[in-house]
Amino acid sequence: MPETFLKFFMALQISFSKPQRRHFGVYMMGSIVCQEKHTLRALSEAVIESGAACNLYRFVAISPWSMSDLEKRRWQLVLDTLPEYPEGTYCFLIIDDSICAKTGKKMEAAGWFKGDDGKKHEFGHDVVTSHCVIGEQEFPVGLKPYFKEVWCQETKTRFYTRNELAAQLIREFKPPEGVKVIVLFDAWYLNPTVIKAVKERKFNWISRAKSNRVFHEGQEKENLSTLAKKLDRQNLPKVQVSGSSYLVYSCNLSLNTLGNTRVLVTFDAEKPDKRPVFLATDMIKLSARQVLEFYTVRWRIETFYRDVKQLLGFSDYQMRKARAQKRHWQLVLTAYTLLRLQQFTEAGSLTESPQTLGEQCRSLRQHNNEELIRLICQQSSQGKSPESICRSLRLAA
């Protein structure tokens, strides 16, 4: 491993046995340098002198170690590495879920879930995660799999809704000292269960709202869609955020089950006839521009899901057991975190970013290949035959 990556790897201080620590290291490096589908065999073959794939299976499915301990130590490593922030620095905690599409019908806890488009259903697993963003820095925080109620009943496991899992992630979040936390989520999570958790932690929130969300005006009830139809779009003020222009109407409304809330009705300035997007927040004094700027940060969790799936094999697992699946997700989040920590540290500052995650993976892959060449040359100089070298390094002859 490169020195900076190894430094953070050792700083995790997980209470592993010596064999477990070795398998943990293989899983981390394999997740990063593997160019194929991230099966256990592919992870094992991607790392020099890693041993057999069955060792990785025993590590992820059978070996006794704590997932919660790994998650806590991973986040504590992030907190220990981050700089001290000025009082009131904004810290965004993003809540969302993502589906890991699968084809194996015998995988534990797999089921049909509604896709991101809200129409198409996908078979697989659904995970709810929290993601922390401070300026240019971002790290995954927590992960909780959502299991269907039927499966929970069959396995005598306690069932939690996605909203309850999101509330747990919010309650468990340990932010850096002195920051002001704003929780960002989409319309699915705009409900009393999640909002209660936000209020308990004395955080603030910004969310997208559904068009049928009801608000009270005096004794009358109306929904946001009806409000939008009454607006004169051509005379709304234009707000520019991140290179895009919006026509925005903002006001304070009493939303059903939420109380007094700042609401934004936003139209695409280039295509004002398109359906509006509704945003809501408990920070009633924020300007429309601030609300829009803050909510655009939520997109960072979408790019996070893309990166961990495309680069680190987050959804490539083939293990049938739910325990192994949950451990795989935690291990991938740890690999992502180590990459992020290496990325900022090698920049010489935690506010700069020298490489993309894809470039980091390619760089570590090159380092792995250079180490392989070094070992081949070393064994060749000792007089070993090509066949012997291939056997010892588990290479195709």
Mark where each language-model region is.
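Short secondary-structure transition/capping motifs
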Residues: 32, 45, 62-67, 115, ...
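A generic secondary-structure signal
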Residues: 46, 77-81, 168-176
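Gly/serine-rich nucleotide phosphate-binding loop at the start of the catalytic core
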Residues: 1-68
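Generic alpha-helix structural propensity
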Residues: 23, 35-39, 51-55, 65, ...
